[in-house]
Amino acid sequence: MTMMKNMLLILWTLSVSTLVGQDREQVAEETVTTNHSVVIKGKSVPFQATTGTQPVWDESGKAVAAVHYTYYLRTDVKNRAGRPLVISFNGGPGSGSVWMHLAYTGPKILKIDDEGFPIQPYGVKDNPNSILDEADIVFVNPVNTGYSRIIDEEVDRKMFFGVTADIKYLAEWINTFVTRVNRWESPKYLIGESYGTTRVSGLALELQNAQWMYINGVILVSPTGLGIDRNGPVGAATRLPYFAAAAWYHNQLSETLQNRDLEEMLAEVEGYAINELMPVLAKGGFVGKEERSAAAKKMAEYSGISEKVILQHNLDISPSFFWKELLREEGFTVGRLDSRYKGIDRMDGGSRPDFNSELTSWLHSFTPAVNFYYRNVLNYKTDIKYNMFGPVRPWDRNGDNSGEDLRQAMAQNPYLHTMIQSGYYDGATQYFDAKYTMWQIDPSGKLKDRLSFKGYRSGHMMYLRNEDLISANDHIRDFIKMSLPKPGEPAKY
């Protein structure tokens, strides 16, 4: 009898261990659906949330990865064909979709203060500014981010982790998703943040060329350079307006400049950077002494960095040095992704901060929120870890022609519009650099009526500041409405 009990105990233990092991391995396909409602702009919006996985197949049709997504569908809409679908990606590469999902466009947002700083208790609340009133949304986690995983360990990782590979498999995945949820008739939009802008710019063309899917709009939130070269004088000049914005925020400029409106001042700095500073920098070591000194003096006036230090750096202050130098005398660094944030280093000396002060703050608040939200609100229960940043390296960065891809997609599709959203205090993907990217996308000037830029008084994730959360979502609504063709309007030049 004792032996039988021991055998049963062993079998029970093995069965439990097996179940736990299964829970730690992502499955190719599963979904959980729940029903909710949220008040947006004062009106109740009923919606269905479906979260789960959809496979990525190799060329033989074998499932090799599971991509996790969350799809929000407004349920009181009769004309589904006319209802826009927004497909959302974050960046990294390697970042989950949590950032825009739980802080920007989704129906729930994390609990933070009005400037975006963490507060306790952690959790989520209704988002009265979500775009779900105007469009359905799917948030996608590329392979190895969020709950997405490789499920065939023998698969070549190069299938997923590179500029071109990423775009290729995700285009195929989007085709399958749109087919499964029956949204081919719907106007479709891509939104990407940071590296996600490289992704969606490439997807705009890949979807057209390989999946025969034409979209209505691309929204670039804090865009990368999209493969457009800006080394040398261009990069050194275009970062000055960001320096001015960060210095203005921290009261490091002259009283005259501090008393001016930020955007008014930035327009002046932009003009100087393009029209005067860039030609000086183009002369390199052959610039005259007086011209060099005058440029250093003007840069110091706009950046809050001393003229002496600027001259020591040959008029080329790197962003990482700026983050360390701006508040050095006060004993602080400033954040890379959002320079409103301050950090404290081990020592005030050095040429770059010890850590990104804004990122630790964001992880502080986002990680508890996303784990709580999936398990307790969406009823998605798993022992798999949500990868805020997943293992996707080495990442093949060769072949990044995403800016040109976007231009080609827009040229081939008269319906396609693009909007850029940037925060003035973003030191990683600087706002004036984003403007420069927009200018370079279309050298012909024939697409500029379909290209637009919006700036915000915050950083990389401008939506963390409540005032910008409201306006940025309104700008997306307006963009969607503007870019929808009138009934019967043909796609032609």
Task: Give, region by region, the residue ranges found by the protein language model.
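Glycine-rich nucleophile elbow surrounding the catalytic serine of serine-hydrolase chemistry
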Residues: 192-205
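N-terminal cap/lid subdomain of alpha/beta-hydrolase-fold enzymes
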Residues: 61-161, 439
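Alpha/beta-hydrolase fold nucleophile elbow
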Residues: 183-195
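Short alpha-helix in the alpha/beta-hydrolase fold that links the catalytic acid
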Residues: 416, 430-440
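Alpha/beta-hydrolase fold catalytic core
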Residues: 284-429
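A catalytic-pocket lid/entrance helix-loop region that shapes and gates access to the active site
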Residues: 107-111, 204, 208-301
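Catalytic histidine-centered segment of alpha/beta-hydrolase-like enzymes
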Residues: 457-468
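Conserved acidic catalytic loop of the alpha/beta-hydrolase fold
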Residues: 168-186
